[in-house]
Amino acid sequence: MKRFMAAAIAVMALAALPALASEATFERNLSVSGQVELTVSTGSGHIHITQGAGNQVHVYGHVKSNWGSDSEERVKEIAANPPIEQTGNIIRIGGHHENYHNISIDYDVQAPANSFLEASSGSGDVNVAGVGENAKLSTGSGSIHATGLKGGFTVNTGSGDIYAEQTGDGDVKAQTGSGRIELKDIRGSLRAGTGSGDIKVNGSPVGDWRLETGSGSIEFTPGNTGFTLDASTGSGTVRTEHEMAVQGSFDKHHIVGKINGGGPTVRIQTGSGDVRIL
């Protein structure tokens, strides 16, 4: 009897659930004739952008609805009329998130390498490979992985790791509320910060740098670049593998001095963690 009652309760519980997830896909090819200004946004879903042909933008979308009695109809409607707008070489993908309650859209996009790029997700990872001049990448919750970014760029996530590689010169900003930051081949000014997580950077500080974490270690590899170092930790040690002309403080928690003859100021600070200049 007990087994029968348990089975009956389980059946009734399943019957009470809303309709299961629905999904659909769409593809579009957009012809372009010059440098593209590309914006991609989704309220919930991932964004993957890779290098494609120089005369077109290819969009593949995956629409999903978690629950809802009319979910299948809504998903099919979005797939039939995806949120894509084109005016010449200006392309906007996504937007109108307020109309997509309980619906997420993943975007996989191929675009010309020199496209001006802005990509944002409310919740989901953002991955970029070989595309983006002066890129702006953000997600509310998720990781960012970007390579081949041309010129300056800005990357920001509320919670998640950041990995980015720069090609050429330009100013860089990288921020995460909680997560690790790794930046490679940076040439320009830099501001990188995380509330909790390690920071690892290599590059040439041709402008001032500021690296900050509330809790975590910081590692900086400058090569032969000259700069002025001001590094401190609340709990941990500061060490450098380079010869340095000391200017003021020099102890295990705080050092100030010129490396390779000095230059732009590199300020490094962690509340709890070690600092290494390699």
Label for each model-derived stretch:
Residues 1-278:
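Intrinsically disordered, low-complexity terminal regions
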